[in-house]
Amino acid sequence: MSLSEKQINQIAYLARLSLNEVQLKNNTQDLNAIFSLIEQLANIETDGIEPMLHPLHMFQRLRKDVVIEKEQSVLFQSVAPKTRNGYYLVPTVIE
């Protein structure tokens, strides 16, 4: 698949972009290069290849899931302009 300069110009128009001639030519070349790479990837033979979940066959050592911060909601709410019953009160934006 490749795009013509006319098609790139139409895409730029729809995206509300204005491209000069140099930008149009560069963007056309860049997008066509990307499409060429995508076509190469699509043509790779992958039959018989197992999907992998992770590129390494090693496992990461995980740390224990322990709470390391203290409850500070009372401190945070003490500096808030308005609170009620543990909730922050903010001005109405949409009615």
Curated annotation (Swiss-Prot):
Tell me if Ligase is a UniProt keyword of this record.
yes
Q: Which GO terms describe its molecular function?
A: asparaginyl-tRNA synthase (glutamine-hydrolyzing) activity; ATP binding; glutaminyl-tRNA synthase (glutamine-hydrolyzing) activity
Catalysed reaction(s)? L-glutamyl-tRNA(Gln) + L-glutamine + ATP + H2O = L-glutaminyl-tRNA(Gln) + L-glutamate + ADP + phosphate + H(+); L-aspartyl-tRNA(Asn) + L-glutamine + ATP + H2O = L-asparaginyl-tRNA(Asn) + L-glutamate + ADP + phosphate + 2 H(+)
The EC code for this enzyme is 6.3.5.-
| One matching Pfam family | GatC
The GO annotation for biological process reads:
glutaminyl-tRNAGln biosynthesis via transamidation; regulation of translational fidelity; translation
**Record's keyword annotation contains ATP-binding:** yes
**UniProtKB keywords:** ATP-binding, Ligase, Nucleotide-binding, Protein biosynthesis
Q: What does this protein do?
A: Allows the formation of correctly charged Asn-tRNA(Asn) or Gln-tRNA(Gln) through the transamidation of misacylated Asp-tRNA(Asn) or Glu-tRNA(Gln) in organisms which lack either or both of asparaginyl-tRNA or glutaminyl-tRNA synthetases. The reaction takes place in the presence of glutamine and ATP through an activated phospho-Asp-tRNA(Asn) or phospho-Glu-tRNA(Gln).
On subunit structure and binding partners, the annotation says: Heterotrimer of A, B and C subunits.
For this chain, the family text in UniProt reads: Belongs to the GatC family.
Kindly provide the name given to this protein in its UniProt entry. Aspartyl/glutamyl-tRNA(Asn/Gln) amidotransferase subunit C
Q: Which organism is it from?
A: Ruthia magnifica subsp. Calyptogena magnifica
Gene behind the chain: gatC
